[in-house]
Amino acid sequence: MYLLITESPAKAKKIQGFLNENYKVLSSCGHIRDLEKKKTKVYGDPKGFGIDVDNDFKPKYVIMSEKRDVVKNLKSGSIDREIIFAADDDREGEAIAWHTANVLKSPIKKDNRIIFREISKAAIIEALKTPRQIDMNEVNSQQARRIIDRLIGFKLSPCLWKNINTKEKGLSAGRVQSALLNLVEKRDDHIRKFVPDEVYTTEGSFEEIDKKCPFTKISDIDTEDLFENFAQDRVFKKASIEEKKVKDYPEKPFITSTLQQTASRSFGFAIKHTMNIAQKLYEGGHITYMRTDSMYISDDFSKKVKKFVGDNFNSSDYCKPGAKKVKGAQEAHEAIRVTSLTKPDDLEPIEMKLYNLIYDRTVTSHMKPCEYLMYKVRVTNKDIQDDGYFTVSHKRLMYPGYKIYYDKSLKEEGKPDINETYTLEECIATQKPGNMPQYYDESSIVSLLEKTGIGRPSTYSTIVGTLDNRKYTEKRDYKEPDKEIKTLTLTKDDEIIEEEKMVKGNIQKKRIIITPLGLKVLDYLRSHFMNIIHETFTSQVENDLDLVANGELNYVDVIRKVYDSFITIVDGQMKNISRNVGDMPLLGKIKGNDIFLGDGKFGPYMKITGKKVKNMNISNYLKLVNKRTEDFTIKDAEKVMSYPKKINNNIYIFLGPHGFYMKYNGTIFTIEQRPDGEYSEEYCMGLV
């Protein structure tokens, strides 16, 4: 008699239906143990967060309070049964199996752990025939990640509480989340400072074709003069023709990150939403495991796709996909694919959308590329041949390849009609600002995380969600600035018309943008912990964890390396807390007086201590110099304190709550608001 333990109730129910009465299938409902967490007199004391720092970072695990009934059920279900652990085939799954074995006092044997990549009867039976031992390298890699993240979170968070002036509660800093926050702000900063180049394009419309053709200028002729030449002779002759074969390849099989990105672009799904649907599809036995770095598809299933392609299209359309390697990929698994080429009829509409996406990709990734023959025809005439040429493009379908999956009517096309002459109808030259950079959305965030090696696909959803939950970022639409566009048009009637118009800026939908609170937290982390929030550090930790999983590094050494990189700074920061006034951080000293930065109901201000305590509002100063509160430095404080500034015996410049103003013999004058706050005597006397 056997007890088979998986981590999901839905998965347990599905598997129970495949097995006979000798097997009982129960679920652990995820992790049943976690690091101990208890209150201590001093927050940040290692004794409070379940890690013995002085004993090789030995963890202390306790059963989670909400899982006590689950554990009780597992213990009673294991009586007189041999236990088999069937959690997911990844590091979290391996750790769940190990923790469950420890709690149930089940020995780590060579044959009590099974793995499978799809929930089907054949896959489960095969897994039971080939059991293995719980992989302690994978377990230790997961333990190292958990311990590192607990250490950083519990050690850095008190520094944030004491050094950041905010009404928000529960500030915290995580290793991976902080690295992403840093990258999000870099993009924000790049957009703030972006100055677009002017883009110039010239396009012509011809009688013989139904699309606009670009003009390539090869001289410095003025556009208006060029258009006058066009008006003199509108007939353009073929000067040259270039033929080029082009292949349009199908997309590779889905991995976690590409599924998340494609679902985001195609349906607007959030990462978490995509993964929740994929989890249901997996537990229902419709797709393979959805957390994977590998593009590999098994030979057995590829043979099924080959038959499907041959039966529905042509056997010559089949081509087995290559397994391209992804940066940081663990690649122990298959890609995300459907488990059967017969579609289910019991899915919810939202589930069917994602299922069809995976189904289509499974099939088309096994098909040959679409092939085109591209023709680029240069046309010009004797009046402008030294000034440039138009390019007329034609595309001929030579072989539909994978695209026949979407449109069975596609077939090889004949050679397009390429004229000897083309008659220009109209031409438009446009001058406009170049496109501004895009704020990140969830799809591009996934691409960024993948490119930099921060986190792993299975954690992407959590990383993005954590920043949002902590109010360090927000998801909102962003309207780009309106654009001024200048056009010069040569009409059919030989008129040359010049126009200027304002075009509304594009709306960037659902963008992830850093909040003022996120900026405060990041500014502090950059000032003191840049070494551990930089993407190269976080990526290196991920690489080290991979080496632990492969048995090439000791997990304690990885933890110690990370801990040693920040603990000295943390201790120093905690010692400096006593120098702050309440929650107000100390900027520095000016003439022996401590200067603190605060945020009140009338906006940011600086507190000057000494014989008398004085508060000075800095809201208008920040607007004048285009700075954020987080960027206000002791040098800015010195500048603010330099006012009132004497111009002569009768004239003084003041900095008040509403900006700079002038006093002349006691009379107040409104003056121009200058970021540098510098005003000459000549300027001031001109006002008088």
List where the protein language model places each region.
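Basic, low-complexity terminal or inter-domain segments flanking catalytic cores
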Residues: Y2, K14, E21, S78-R81, ...
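A conserved hydrophobic secondary-structure block that centers on an alpha-helix together
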Residues: T262, S266-H273
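C-terminal or mid-to-C-terminal helical accessory/interaction module adjacent to the motor/catalytic core
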Residues: I119-F206, E243-K247
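Metal- or metallocofactor-binding catalytic centers and their adjacent structured scaffolds
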Residues: I221-P253, Q260, D417-E420, T430
